[in-house]
Regions:
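Contiguous, structured surface segment used for ligand recognition
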Residues: 1-133
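Substrate-binding cleft of carbohydrate-active enzyme catalytic domains
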Residues: 131-200
């Protein structure tokens, strides 16, 4: 199994889990709000790697959901920590918080990239060594990046479990009243920066 970053513990189990066309993603009700975002990231990953379209719904924490992928909180775990368990019956991701759930989702997406719709049974437990893992992007040198491209950067960072994007900007930001700084550029606006922040 190929993961980046490498999880702390990977234990192969017996059997395989076959993703199916009538599969669904079941969210723990305690994940209201951001849980939809995590489920949509997973839904998009499933579609990209297998061509299948999974529905998203809510379920009861701890209940067995045969054939489903369950995303739930486990408040006994630390912040950003997760367990991903793939069995023949179901896939379950338990995170200590929303970030942990998201990192479990990204690990599952990396598994699907390698194995497609037939996943080996496995138990993966992981947590980051550092609470902040970032990327510093110099937005002022060379071509000015668009908002859509910066969102792609954020998506790629999330895939590799980086959690902080720092932008260095000078003349590529639309400073009010200082048009001479950005006159010949296509600068980022304050609204676009806020949109990127909300997206991240």
């Amino acid at each position: 199994m190929k993961f980046l970053p490498k999880p702390k513990e990977v234990k192969l189990l017996t059997g395989e889990h076959a993703l199916c066309y009538d599969g669904r993603i079941v969210l723990d009700g305690r994940l209201l709000g951001n849980g939809d975002t995590y489920a949509k990231v997973l839904q998009k990953g499933i579609k990209k790697e297998t061509g299948m379209q999974y529905d998203i719904g809510y379920g009861v924490p701890g209940r067995k959901e045969t054939g489903a992928i369950v995303l739930e909180l486990d408040e006994t775990r630390k912040s950003q920590q997760y367990v991903l368990q793939v069995t023949e019956e179901e896939i379950r991701i338990q995170g200590g918080d929303g970030a942990g759930v998201l990192y479990g989702v990204q690990t599952l997406c990396q598994m699907m990239h390698e194995y497609g719709a037939l996943l080996p049974a496995v138990r993966i437990e992981d947590e980051p060594d550092l609470p902040v893992r970032g990327y510093y992007l110099d937005e002022t040198r060379g071509r000015v990046l668009t908002l859509s491209y910066l969102k792609q950067v954020a998506d790629r960072m999330a895939y590799y479990k980086l959690n902080q994007l720092q932008l260095y900007v000078e003349h590529t930001y639309l400073f009010s009243g200082l048009s001479e700084m950005w006159r010949d550029e296509t600068p980022l606006t304050a609204e676009e920066i806020r949109e990127l922040d909300a997206y991240c």
